[in-house]
Amino acid sequence: MANLIIPNEDQHNYIVGIDFGHGETSAAICPIEWGKDAGQRETKILDIDLDIAARKKVITSSICRVSGGILIGDEAFEHTTDNNGIRVCFKQKPFSIDGEAEKLMIDYMKAVYARVRESQEELSDTNHIVYIARPSGWTEEAKEIYRQMAIEAGIPLGGLTSESRAAIFYAKSPNVNFAKEISKGAIVFDLGSSTLDFTYLSDNDKPIDFGYDLGASIIDNAIFENMMQKDENIRMFTEKYPAYNDALKFKARKFKEEAYSRNENSKTIGGFPLGNIIADNEDSYDEYADVYVKLRITNLAELNTMIESTTCYMKRLKNALIDFKENKIPEKSVNGVFLTGGASRMNFIRPLIAETFNLPLDKVKIDNDNPSLTISRGIALLGATDVITSVLIKKLRKKILSLINNEQMLAKLIDSLVEEVIAQSWDVVSSTCSYWVKFGKTTDEEELKTLVDKNFKDFQRNKVSQIVNDTLYHFINETSEDIRKQMNEIISRYAPGREISSTVKIQLGNIEAINSSLSDMSKAITEICDSISNTLVDIFWKAIAVYLWGIFCLPYYIFKALRSDESKRKGKASEILGKKAKVTSQVRQNVKAELGKNADFKNSVTMSLHKYFTKLIELNLQKVIIPIE
């Protein structure tokens, strides 16, 4: 496992997020406001100039190795054929840190990070952590190699996150205000150079990711093949000097971006002489330097028609939208779509999405500032939250011991158990007395006691176990809610919006893991049910016996002369039931004493509750932790 930087409150002051995209690269910086509660934090995200001279935040993912250094972005095109030549759109899933493609990517990472340090003078060697994004769908092995590549490039890496998750995080921030849609169910639509990725989110579902090979480079290639190479001279040039194809495709991309950034009725002219991309000392310069590459459209409709007729891109995009809707998220509610990636500005994207998901156009949102910066901003914001949350988790774990007070919990559980047992036990006494009054044969104490004894045995077999289980269930539910509230008091200070949500039912999360922690309690519960049941009759009769002599000792013949047997039984039963408060008070003391002196019960229950709530807290902490890889 790569050695990632561990956040240090005394050392790190800044988070840098870098999006090494397939087509373009951007970076953002965010200060870590350690000493401030959430309500006091400003959480400023600043975009970093990666082309310092031109003050450009986004550069083309291009690299050219030249003698004496490495050039990236637009500068790379000034040395098209030097040494190994220019490379664009070279990012790919890594397979070996020693591979040629991986070494090229390491060089690019190193050069971009150097630009970050040059642009942001406040950064020192030790006062910041960098987080980077990676495409969805990479294997754990590929992620590990990518981490190692970043570290090899000299980047102080805090971890990776998926591009879609970074976009989601930014979409939920106040900068975009898309959190409401996400809570009800929404999609993040990430159109990159190589792939189109969808992520469905809602508060009630795990994220659903899926990608399609519909990156915007398809359109770059269409412009290259059907507009540039339409000229015979250009076609011959590319056949004779294929090393220039990447440079020409870069120009095609720039033309596409320029066209879709304009009003749809505006013309776009992006032609240039080949001399702009051919080095002066190349043999091809004299022959082709003056050849003009024609790039011109009257309006976007003309460009869209060419794209559709040659690539069927819009039809394929529509099919991908339908496939995701019907096969990946069937019956899911879609309340909005958030677009990210520079290519999402193309004018046919939003209407297609709105039509497919039956949404008003204003529910298909785009970061109008610059969608090319969405991922890097999201990474920086997510990284800053990660380091703050890492401190929060440490505080919460220290808090566990105080959240789980064994003695208090046991006392509360016993109180709840005793009250429920007494209430339902007295119902047995009451219902038995009523039956005896109506159907008794005598007015003798022994007859009533026999009936009560029989009914208590039924109560033992059929009711006590359920009482204990129900009491335990409600106790766990209430205690879990108390713990949740105490945890949220801490969470809201550090990471508002990540509080553990309240639930009507006990959400056990990993049910098997938690149930295993309660297994020790099962035996003790069974034993205590038997213990309570077996002694319950004696406990009640000991409590009632104090009052029985006075009730049953009067001469039988006096009552017989004055009243019927049923009337006498009713009088005696009323006398007994009238002693409810005194009897139940005595029973309460006796049952608590029985439970209190049962060491096995006390030990197994306290141990099991501690294990249960420790695991429950840990599972809830996993919901708070930012998913950094």
Question: Could you describe each region identified by the protein language model?
Answer:
Residues D74-N84, I218-P351, M409, I414-S522, ...:
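Gly/charged contiguous loops adjacent to phosphate- or pyrophosphate-bearing nucleotide/cofactor binding elements
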